[in-house]
Amino acid sequence: MLSKKLKKVILGFVTALCLTGSAMPVMADTVRFNGTVPGDPKSKRIPKSDDEQKFYVTGTYFSSYGTLSCRSYQLENQHVFSETKDISRTAPSNKGKYKSWAKPHVYYFMSSHSSLNGMNVEGRYTP
């Protein structure tokens, strides 16, 4: 027969497993981008993994102090797009809302522009 102390330890262990096992982390699909304006202003396409109606962009490298204006588009229907959001060295992260319903599990890409020719930005984009 198991002692009370051992039963409590087993019960505590099982409870901890249930709590941590049921909390599955959810990660949105993210793609790295390397964009040069005006040369290559688009990110790789990536499927949107959730139904959150926002996109996220973070610059990790900026070749200059200019501003990069970013907008997310649905690949199959470019009438589905987000508001335009700016990132820069001093404000490298931003998020924007989609202007119409952005379906999950279809492909999106980010397009960007800057008034500063030759600006290069590397970073992450999550549709």
Which positions does each model-derived feature cover?
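Mature secreted bioactive peptide module from preproproteins
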Residues: 29-127
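N-terminal prepro-regions of secreted/extracellular proteins
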Residues: 1-48
